[in-house]
């Protein structure tokens, strides 16, 4: 099997909880050794702790500054992007799709959205975890039209576009098409 990526010498030290103790580990930037999907030979990807974190099969890839470590696995055609952290025993697989935005809202936290096993969208934001619809309701209840509510509502609309949930005809009607 042709390996599709290598670990580069570029690394970051991060802290993770292992066996009840906070430990520093290194995650290494990856570089593509062959072309696949939208990745070209030589493209730099995100960071993994070991080669066990990212499969050489399929079109799975870690983009940007995303980090995959511990026993986490990314495989099949799944993509992990941006500043996402996939860790613990997490599995991102098949055609999984994940989307997040950092430093947003009243807590300046990271809001993560991903396709779940039922093909719905799960949202995590601070201590909230629920569906995209439940998140929208919570945002309306807690923030209404204040600046944080506006940020979250834009993020929800962007997520709908990202996951292909937007109303296709809305844009056409507004543009007179």
Residue ranges and their predicted role:
Residues 1-6, 97-177:
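Intrinsically disordered, low-complexity terminal regions
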Residues 1-63, 67-69, 177:
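Extended, small-residue-rich solenoid/repeat segments and analogous flexible loops
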Residues 10, 38, 69, 75, ...:
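Generic N-terminal leader/processing signal
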Residues 18, 29-34, 73-75, 107, ...:
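Arginine residue identity/basic-tract feature
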Residues 32-37, 66, 78, 120, ...:
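N-terminal, helix-rich and Lys/Arg-enriched segments in bacterial and organellar proteins
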Residues 33-35, 51, 89, 95, ...:
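Generic structural motif
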Residues 55-98:
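A detector of tandem-repeat and repeat-rich interaction/domain scaffolds
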């Amino acid at each position: 099997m042709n390996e599709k990526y290598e670990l580069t010498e570029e690394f970051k030290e991060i802290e993770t909880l292992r066996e009840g103790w906070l430990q520093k580990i290194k995650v290494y930037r990856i570089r593509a050794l062959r072309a696949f999907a939208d990745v070209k030979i030589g493209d730099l990807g995100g960071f993994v702790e070991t080669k066990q974190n990212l499969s050489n099969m399929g079109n799975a890839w870690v983009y940007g500054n995303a980090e995959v470590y511990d026993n986490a696995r990314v495989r099949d055609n799944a993509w992990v992007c941006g500043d996402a952290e996939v860790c613990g025993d997490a599995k991102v697989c098949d055609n999984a799709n994940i989307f997040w935005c950092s430093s947003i809202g009243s807590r300046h936290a990271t809001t993560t959205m991903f396709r779940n096993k039922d093909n719905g969208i799960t949202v995590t934001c601070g201590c909230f975890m629920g569906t995209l619809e439940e998140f929208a309701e919570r945002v309306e209840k807690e923030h209404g039209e204040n600046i944080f509510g506006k940020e979250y509502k834009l993020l929800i609309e962007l997520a709908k576009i990202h996951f292909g949930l937007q109303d296709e005809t809305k844009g056409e009607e507004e543009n007179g098409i």
